Curated annotation (Swiss-Prot):
Family assignment from sequence similarity: Belongs to the G-alpha family.
Family annotation (CDD domains): G-alpha
UniProt source species: Dictyostelium discoideum (Social amoeba)
GO MF annotation: an example: mitogen-activated protein kinase binding
Domain of life: Eukaryota
Any one biological process term the GO annotation gives: sporulation resulting in formation of a cellular spore
Region annotated G5 motif, chain positions: 318-323
Gene designation per UniProt: gpaD
Region G1 motif, annotated ranges: 33-46
Protein's name in the database: Guanine nucleotide-binding protein alpha-4 subunit
Amino acid sequence: MRFKCFGSEETEQSSKIDKSIETDRRKLRKDVKLLLLGPGESGKSTIFKQMKIIQEDGGYSVEELLEYRAFVYSNCISQMEALLTASAKLNIELEVENKQRAANVLRRTIGNEPWLLLAADIKHLWEDKGIKETYAQKDKHFQLNDSAAYFFDNIDRYMREDFVPNEQDVLRCRVRTTGIQESEFTFDKIRLKIVDVGGQRSQRRKWIHCFDCVTAVIFVAAMSDYDQVLREDESVNRTRESLALFKEIVNCDYFKETPIVLFLNKKDLFKEKLKRVPLQSCFSDYTGPNKYKDAAMFIQSQYLAQGPSPRTIYTHATCAVDTENIKFVFRAVRQTILSQALEHF
């Protein structure tokens, strides 16, 4: 004998709920909102730009690339200005024939000084022994963008009248994020809405408005920043600041049920810096060898210790300017966040 547990009305209501859940599941498979968080200069905005490249039918049009030409010029000029200012503070002499070139760069006003003349001066200055000596002391005595050498090394290409920036130029261009960037991309048949918020302290109060309906949080931390200080507060170590910020995010009530993905970024720079700057100089409790694998595991453990136990935090070592690396990582992230998010339906 069969018993009816529900009347027709209850059965119909149950069916509607099941359909609603299935609709939500399908929508989740197609619509994913990712929140990119992290301190300033961690590489968040570079990853945001990578999404335009790795998405289906992605990449930058010639028109879009040309929009970055002025940013390329500006990055070259501002970074040489930083080197010249630092060389003066460090009492490092430039070669006699380059002193006028240095004056040209320092007194320039954007739009008034022809780019080709400034570029020629920058090219000669980058070959100056004094500038090379100054460059070797970056991070320790002054701040310089990670891609400064890349731009100087490519100055001949930038001096061509038919110069069109390539995707590496775009990825390496430093354009400070001062607000909220939001864009939609399609990656592996999933529609991603990615929100990138400025990481400087003054920008973080804006984050709260982005917390609704977030599928996952991607926190970007620069591993190579362990010996550097904040631009906005030179008394604060960048990695210490990043750890404190991650602790705040991972323990936030808004994200109790939200997957947290940690990108330990700039792994390439971290590997190179370890050859020059021991991790022990900034983390006295680190007792392992000054090798990439051991040091990276220590940095990872510092971040994982900020979260409540036994919460799972998905970690990936990344290089934001390496398109293939970011594509590989996002495929892993896609599977992880969808699997976990669907468990809650």
